[in-house]
């Protein structure tokens, strides 16, 4: 599972990435700062389920802060897009191609309207960020259309001549974009296309199909950055009305980055996504740091309740992708052979079953599956039992 961060230059995309991963991404105020894609590890925030049993988890990967557990996932920051990227302008083809593997996109925009369409600094409030939403939709749709259009007539004729199923054939052709057969079936039905005569499909049909498959394979959440600047609140409400099908969440990437760096330096105690922090030793702070932390506490946390960065990460994976955090554990003992409590956590796709979970843990457990036991209720369930968020299961398997 891969999350991609997209957006034009200078909207705070690299700052968001660094805040989410605390990796060393180069951050500067000009286009093409991140020529090569930056990959990093970000974290999802969930309750530490071991607390329900009076214990604390010992994650093999990720970490625990007080009552929360942070689960790692892969995040990629692709260099800033510019209009015409699908035609290769800027380094568009490379950027879009890097996003091919992404399962969900976080589109960072400048809510303050102080970055123009080229990613250049502009007067506060002078640019409408709605244009950025439309622009990225257009670039991605044209990218998908370009892939779909490539040799379309020959492809369509071959499907007919060889009596192939167009849904299977299209899914195979577009598998690099994570298009599945079911997605193609749904899209063709929704657009009422004649699946028996794909060679009669018109350009407009292909455009609609490309756009629909893009929405299905690259769901997108909009991160409205610089939410603390004057025009941002008004812009955010306007965007929600203009694009009711998108999830918009305001954020301050700079605020989150400052808090995480201060926490890493042991200047403050801060749990990502919370509405407060504690200064550990005020004597260690210089005047500039005191002012910055005071501003974040008042103008960001006090006003909005959080910086928004953690909320966006969680929403991208748990709401848009509908993935679930599921834990393997013993019905009578949460510790592994080394004494670690609930060391593992797996992110499972929607509609996963107990059998899917067994295979995720180990192939042998899946192949020899007998039953799963819900650690909370001690109830045994079969292989088709649907998983839900924060489940804890023991897998019972034969030899």
Where are the language model's segments positioned?
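Conserved G1/Walker A P-loop phosphate-binding module
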Residues: 1-161, 170-174, 215, 219
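Canonical P-loop GTPase G-domain recognition
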Residues: 147, 157, 220-221, 227-330
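Non-catalytic, charge-rich alpha-helical accessory subdomains
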Residues: 158-238, 325, 330
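Short, contiguous acidic and Ser/Thr-rich linear segments
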Residues: 338-353
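Short amphipathic, charge-patterned alpha-helical segments
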Residues: 351-364
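Short acidic beta-strand-loop surface patches of small beta-rich interaction domains
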Residues: 370-386
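Loop/turn positions that initiate beta-strands
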Residues: 390-391
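Short, charged beta-turn/beta-strand-edge "cap" motif at the junction between a beta-strand
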Residues: 397-399
């Amino acid at each position: 599972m891969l999350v991609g961060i997209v957006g034009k230059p200078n909207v705070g995309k690299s700052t968001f990435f660094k805040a989410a991963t605390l990796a060393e991404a180069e951050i500067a105020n000009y286009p093409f700062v991140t020529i090569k894609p930056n990959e990093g590890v970000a974290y999802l925030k969930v309750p530490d389920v071991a607390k329900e049993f009076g214990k604390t988890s010992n994650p093999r990967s990720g970490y625990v802060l007080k009552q929360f557990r942070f689960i790692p996932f892969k995040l990629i920051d692709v260099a800033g897009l510019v209009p015409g990227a699908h035609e290769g302008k800027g380094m568009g083809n490379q950027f879009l191609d890097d996003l091919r593997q992404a399962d969900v996109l976080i589109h960072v925009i400048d809510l303050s309207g102080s970055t123009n369409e080229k990613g250049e600094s502009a007067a506060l409030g002078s640019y409408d960020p709605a244009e950025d939403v439309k622009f990225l939709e257009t670039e991605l749709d044209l990218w998908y259309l370009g892939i779909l259009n490539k040799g379309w007539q020959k492809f369509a004729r071959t499907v007919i001549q060889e009596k192939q199923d167009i849904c299977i054939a299209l899914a195979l052709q577009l598998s690099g974009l994570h298009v599945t057969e079911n997605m193609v079936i749904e899209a063709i039905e929704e657009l009422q296309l004649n699946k028996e005569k794909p060679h009669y499909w018109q350009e407009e049909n292909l455009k609609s199909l490309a756009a629909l498959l893009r929405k299905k394979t690259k769901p997108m959440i909009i991160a409205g950055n610089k939410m603390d600047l004057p025009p941002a609140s008004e812009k955010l409400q306007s965007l929600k009305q203009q694009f009711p099908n998108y999830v918009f969440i305001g954020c301050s990437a700079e605020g989150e980055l400052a808090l995480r760096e201060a926490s890493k330096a042991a200047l403050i105690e801060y749990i990502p996504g919370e509405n407060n922090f504690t200064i550990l030793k005020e004597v260690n702070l210089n005047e500039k740091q005191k002012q910055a932390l005071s501003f974040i506490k008042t103008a960001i946390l006090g006003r909005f309740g959080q910086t928004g960065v953690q909320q966006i990460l969680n929403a991208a994976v748990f709401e848009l992708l509908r993935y679930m955090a599921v834990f393997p554990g013993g019905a009578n003992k949460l510790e592994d052979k080394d004494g670690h409590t609930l060391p593992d956590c797996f992110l499972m796709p929607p509609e996963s079953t107990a059998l899917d979970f067994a295979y995720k843990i180990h192939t042998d457990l899946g192949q020899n599956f007998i039953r799963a036991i819900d650690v909370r209720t001690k109830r045994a369930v079969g292989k088709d039992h649907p998983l839900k968020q924060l489940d804890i299961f023991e897998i019972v398997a034969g030899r």
